[in-house]
Amino acid sequence: MDILCEENTSLSSTTNSLMQLNDDTRLYSNDFNSGEANTSDAFNWTVDSENRTNLSCEGCLSPSCLSLLHLQEKNWSALLTAVVIILTIAGNILVIMAVSLEKKLQNATNYFLMSLAIADMLLGFLVMPVSMLTILYGYRWPLPSKLCAVWIYLDVLFSTASIMHLCAISLDRYVAIQNPIHHSRFNSRTKAFLKIIAVWTISVGISMPIPVFGLQDDSKVFKEGSCLLADDNFVLIGSFVSFFIPLTIMVITYFLTIKSLQKEATLCVSDLGTRAKLASFSFLPQSSLSSEKLFQRSIHREPGSYTGRRTMQSISNEQKACKVLGIVFSLFVVMWCPFFITNIMAVICKESCNEDVIGALLNVFVWIGYLSSAVNPLVYTLFNKTYRSAFSRYIQCQYKENKKPLQLILVNTIPALAYKSSQLQMGQKKNSKQDAKTTDNDCSMVALGKQHSEDASKDNSDGVNEKVSCV
């Protein structure tokens, strides 16, 4: 009897709740259709209906039900991530085009920057859209489970390639400052591409264990329905190998490069001052020197002064390049350090830290790291005139630089002037040779005249002697 009473009581309570729900729904629908309800009533009806929908889905914990709830909300974070994706893809495509088409930018450092732009562009194409999709689905993995390991692999690959490219650029600049002769001799386009291939090979080797183990065991890449690295050992080792060790090398070599440039600039300035003092004491009055000696002195003096000016110019160019690269390095460190530090904290203080807070921080910090891929083209635009002019032309669909009228005049007139000057020099040489021949002929004629006069005087003296003897 007690059981029957309890069942009747539960059935009656359920029936009453359903009747009350139907009455409330009918009341709200009638008020809404008749137009008698005001704005606040309509808003309350909407909120109440959403609450009832949430209550009806409380028992449904499947990913599809939760995904529908999150898709109904306005997600401004997804909109911001879409803007970051567009900027990343468009900006890095411009960098690739600039290095490929502009001859001024075709050197070893810019080849590294082009490869870095390729990594950032692929990150924007293959990784960021999937990450935005997980945001829309409440950080649940909406794709097939086998693609989770592949997505994490691409994410780690392109992020590792970015830091490895910056580390290689820093090492290459340091070697160029310390041993410029060896670097200029072996720093061809082929050598630069071989270094880039080595960077990509290292990046692939570091990130390859993710698909190898993740495809075999889903627990290493899934955690509570979210696609992320769940293996603590790989998180620790990967963070140090792919970020902190290259970061340390990059920072040390960058500061050593700056120190070497400052030292070379000081030595160059002191060397130029010493040469100027020696030159002021060694000059003689122009009247006491012949034109030939003056010409020889100018020939021997010009290369030294030109070399000094060229050395200062090269040091200045290196300092400007280091300034731009320093900004790129700093932005990369500032934007990626929070993610990797939080990633290590999630492993070290796993029991004491709040997992929900750590997870929310990682979701924010990873997009701050992605933002560095979109910032690099903006840095090149602000601090490099060649990149800036190339980007502006490419946006206007002008892929070749239009020569200015002055440049066209110089291109048309300089060869003619050079030809005329060469012809003038050849004419002067011919005239000098002809003058030398005429002087030689004159000298030979004078010598013949002198010999003829001597012979004539000799004949006259012989004739006089004969006459005297006859007498």
UniProtKB/Swiss-Prot annotation:
The record marks 229 as: Hydrophobic barrier that decreases the speed of ligand binding and dissociation. G-protein coupled receptor activity is regulated by lipids: oleamide increases HTR2A-mediated activity. Residues 450-471 are annotated as: Disordered. Serotonin binds at residues 155, 343. Residues 451-465 have a biased composition (Basic and acidic residues). Disulfide bonds join 148-227, 349-353. Residues 1-80, 138-146, 216-232, 349-356 are extracellular. One of its GO terms (biological process) is chemical synaptic transmission. The keyword Transmembrane helix applies. It comes from the Eukaryota. Residues 98-111, 172-191, 259-322, 383-471 are cytoplasmic. A motif (NPxxY motif) lies at residues 376-380. Glycans are attached at residue 38. Keywords: Behavior, Cell membrane, Cell projection, Cytoplasmic vesicle, Disulfide bond, G-protein coupled receptor, Glycoprotein, Membrane, Phosphoprotein, Receptor, Synapse, Transducer, Transmembrane, Transmembrane helix. The PDZ domain-binding motif is involved in the interaction with PATJ, CASK, APBA1, DLG1 and DLG4. Interacts (via C-terminus) with MPDZ and PATJ. May interact (via C-terminus) with MPP3, PRDX6, DLG4, DLG1, CASK, APBA1 and MAGI2. Interacts with GRM2 and DRD2; this may affect signaling. This is 5-hydroxytryptamine receptor 2A. It comes from Pongo pygmaeus (Bornean orangutan). The gene is HTR2A.
